[in-house]
Amino acid sequence: EHPMNANINYDEIPDTSAVQEDLLAALSSQHVTVHTNEEPDFDYMENGDVAFVVKNPHNDENLLIELGGEFSVFFGLWHGQYKAVEYDYDRMKKDVAAILAGNAGVLSLYTDGKWQGSTLCPEKVSADADMEKLLERCWQKQEPKEKLLAQGGRVELLYWDPAENKSFMIPAKN
């Protein structure tokens, strides 16, 4: 007996077959291959887990989606993690759609030539973007951001279409 006001959105997704169908439909305009852990490249996955590789028509920067006990999206150096629940699945679909449409890119920070981390930046960044403001909007974790703005380094943006990729040098503040 379900109370009428039960919020269906927080329901666990019990098995991923409906999700797989829904996702394949959402990705129907893309070149997608489906993989299981019976393949050597995917033998780290659990039984029953499925991986979708969305082929990038421009280069080898493919997008990887893994569906298992939780859902994962990999693009460039970014790894997005989503719980296997409806509202998080919807968030994942929005993120994937934004990447494929070029409306989101992977923002990576480097200081001293070392990678400090990556995040998904939900915007198309212009070549003359204000880096401090961009990092305010897109970078949640304080520490590497402060270090970058103080010591200098670089910000890389990776998009589905490599023609949109950007690299910004940040001069040290001394």
What are these regions (language model features)?
Residues E1-M4, N174:
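Short intrinsically disordered terminal tails
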Residues M4-V53:
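N-terminal "first-domain core" detector
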Residues Y10-P14, A18, K83, Y87, ...:
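Alpha-helix boundary/N-cap detector
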Residues A26-T33, N37, G102, S126-D128, ...:
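Surface-exposed polar/charged interaction patches
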Residues P40-Y44, N59-E66, G105-D112:
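Short linear motifs in intrinsically disordered
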Residues D43-K55, V73-G76, G117-P122:
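Generic recognition of long tandem-repeat/solenoid scaffolds
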Residues K55-R91, E132-N174:
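Intrinsically disordered, low-complexity regulatory segments enriched in Ser/Thr/Pro
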